Amino acid sequence: MEKEYIHIILADDDEDDRMFFTDAFDELKINTKVQTFINGAELMNYLNEDTCILPNVLFLDLNMPKKNGIECLLEIKENERFKDIAI
């Protein structure tokens, strides 16, 4: 039986920030799955897929190309499907 994990998504266009973020969670003694996206458009495309596994926690960079964190946040808050995601 597979252990439950905390599904975490980070949307950030800075490669170093994504690396530091994932490394920090790797060092924790909790079972996590960290998924990263390089911009808000990529994140929203994923979240809007029918087969998407919704995260428990979502971290958004405010300044990203294509779609910034504020635009993503507004779009997420408008969708009832995403109401249980901690942002």
Across the structure, where does each feature detected by a protein language model lie?
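Active-site residues of response regulator receiver
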Residues: 12, 60-61
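Phosphate-coordination loops involved in phosphoryl transfer and adenosine-cofactor binding
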Residues: 3-5
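Two-component/phosphorelay signaling modules centered on CheY-like receiver
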Residues: 15-38
